[in-house]
Amino acid sequence: MTKKLQKKIRILYTIPNFNAAGIGKTLINVISRIDKNIFDPYICCRHERGDLFNTAKSLNIPIYISEFTAPMKPRLKGMESVYKLTSFFKKINPDIIHSYNYSDDYSEALAAKLSGIKWIYTKKNMGWGSNAWRIRTKLANAIIPQNQEMVEVFFKGLKKYSLIPIGIDLDEFSNIEKDKTLTEKYNLVNSFPVILTIANIIPIKGIDYLISGFNLINEDFENTKLIIVGEDKTEYADMLKRKVIEMRLNDRIIFTGKQSNVRSYFSIADIFILSSMKTGEGGPISVLEAMASGVLSYGSNVPGIRDQFREFPDQLFESENPGSIANKILHFSRMSNEEKNKRIAVQKEFIRINYSIENEIMRLQQLYVKVFDSKKNTNFNFEESF
């Protein structure tokens, strides 16, 4: 039963764009499920481009197309721009701004502070090179790290963080039937194992190490395949494609480019591998989706990914080590079907307990009410909303 509020809590979500499926999809999942009896959500992004922008529009909430950050150098000009942002935020008049801008910008936080608006940010990556992150953190009313190592490395001793990992829609990734169209398109009939990775092809994702690891085990199998799903319009991707041709693996390694429906790709995979470099990740959603889809998964032993494999340590491999990746592929191939099925079932249960979208929404809503209460002193008991 929902307790009726005299005023809904107005939340403005800021996000650079809806180009990136991970970030955009995460925000759409949150807004589509947040309790509209209690919260009044809005979006601000920089432009209308991006595969998911139309999906965001279908949420039927106000979307502001505007800049919400400003360069802070030179300082005087930066402060002038911040005051302009202050006017923009005051016109929208949210109670809370939740920033999904994952850069180290602090102009947005400063403008919110000057406007008297509570400001929250989600920390998605393991970057912390500049002093700007410290200023951003100082100005925030609450911080949402996405893995335990962020807490220990960046926020130890702070009381204003809430560890809230990304959640996924379990129903979307359960009982997926094998996509025969993809099987035929990529000539996967009688291929084993079919290895899948989903990541934009940029250096931090370590795809070159995955390719080298695949090359080490290629001759151990009659017809294995590696499918690389993700944005491949980059110089790094072009370099990898040349490398694959030089290795004479272009009939075994498939670059699909960016795909809007990654769900179908899980249906054709035997193994999922995320080979990110030692820099680490925030909380890669592709690993969660793979596990929820019933695909046995392996990942680099790095921050972010380590959290997601905390109950499966033998499914982690040394980052930037092709030999270690090759060993995990062989580890999978030597498993009995009984062992594979057991591990897959445990993975699914782990995701259900720890990474469901319902868990994420519940914890976000509790945080919003806590931050709002600190502003308005309403003493609203969020548990009464259920």
Question: Could you say what each language-model-derived stretch is?
Answer:
Residues S99-D105, K123:
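Short His-centered aromatic/hydrophobic patch
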Residues I43-G50, I168, I198, K225-M239:
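Glycosyltransferase donor-sugar binding loop
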Residues E311-G323, H331-N337:
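Conserved acidic donor-binding segment of nucleotide-sugar-dependent glycosyltransferases
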Residues A21-N29, P193-E219, L226, D238-M239, ...:
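A conserved mid-protein helix/loop that constitutes part of the nucleotide-sugar donor-binding site
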Residues K113-Q148, F155-K156:
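A conserved, positively charged/aromatic
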Residues C45, L296-G299:
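Short hydrophobic beta-strand element within catalytic cores of glycosyltransferases
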Residues S174-L188, K241, N337-E338, I344:
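A short helix/loop element that forms part of the nucleotide-sugar donor recognition site in Leloir-type
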Residues E235-D238, N250-Q259, Y265, L316:
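Active-site donor-binding acidic/aromatic loop of nucleotide-activated sugar
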